[in-house]
């Protein structure tokens, strides 16, 4: 490419030269601008969806902590003195969604659902920042938690963003 000559000396004027360059590359410029617009739109939508998801999880954690605070009760004293077989169940959630069975005994699957046979039920609710708040709950609350779910299991979900771990530990004695 030869250097531009000064106007009046027989060369192409600068304005005309720029117009020629723009005409040759206008399609490329429009494609690049379109791609930048699409990329910024995708990033904005992704960030908005992620923000809404995290906000929803924080609300669930706050609601769980409020439910736990309202269901405080003193430790239950066993009323029977007959020897019983005790099965201890401890359920925690990992970073994946997994089902947690509502039954823990093959011959008497609904034992823990009977009010007088549930003992030492403890629910641990996280406050989304890694510390747990152990509280006492009664069998009615435990039944309601499981009955809110569809099917025969309770689903526990944990997010990498908000470690909202909900764990149930309970003992169920069998006569």
UniProtKB/Swiss-Prot annotation:
GO terms for cellular component: host cell plasma membrane; membrane; virion membrane. Signal peptide: none annotated. Tyrosine phosphorylated. It is a single-pass type II membrane protein. Residues 73-108 are annotated as: Disordered. Glycans are attached at residues 120, 138, 152. It is found in: Virion membrane; Host cell membrane. The chain crosses the membrane at residues 29-49. Keywords: Glycoprotein, Host cell membrane, Host membrane, Hydrogen ion transport, Ion transport, Membrane, Phosphoprotein, Signal-anchor, Transmembrane, Transmembrane helix, Transport, Virion. Residues 1-28 are intravirion. GO terms for biological process: proton transmembrane transport. It comes from the Viruses. Residues 50-175 are virion surface. Residues 78-98 have a biased composition (Low complexity). Homooligomer. Interacts with glycoprotein G. Viroporin that forms a ion channel probably displaying low ion selectivity. Plays a role in counteracting host innate immunity by inhibiting TLR7/MyD88/TRAF6 signaling and STAT1 phosphorylation, leading to down-regulation of type-I IFN. Belongs to the metapneumovirus small hydrophobic protein family. This is Small hydrophobic protein. It comes from Avian metapneumovirus (isolate Canada goose/Minnesota/15a/2001). The lineage of its organism: Viruses, Riboviria, Orthornavirae, Negarnaviricota, Haploviricotina. The gene is SH.
């Amino acid at each position: 490419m030869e250097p531009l000559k000064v106007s009046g000396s027989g060369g192409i004027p600068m304005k005309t030269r720029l117009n020629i360059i723009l005409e040759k590359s206008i399609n490329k410029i429009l494609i690049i601008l379109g791609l930048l617009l699409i990329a910024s739109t995708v990033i904005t939508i992704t960030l908005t969806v992620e923000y809404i998801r995290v906000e929803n999880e924080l609300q669930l954690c706050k609601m769980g902590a409020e439910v736990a605070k309202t269901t405080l009760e003193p430790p239950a004293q066993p009323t029977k003195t007959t020897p019983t077989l005790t099965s201890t169940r401890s359920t925690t959630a990992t970073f994946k969604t997994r089902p947690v069975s509502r039954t823990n005994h093959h011959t008497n699957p609904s034992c823990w659902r009977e009010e007088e046979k549930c003992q030492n039920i403890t629910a641990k609710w996280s406050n989304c920042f890694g510390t747990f708040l152990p509280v006492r709950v009664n069998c009615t609350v435990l039944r309601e938690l499981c009955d809110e779910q569809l099917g025969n299991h309770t689903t526990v979900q944990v997010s990498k963003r908000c470690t909202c771990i909900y764990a149930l530990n309970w003992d169920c004695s069998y006569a």
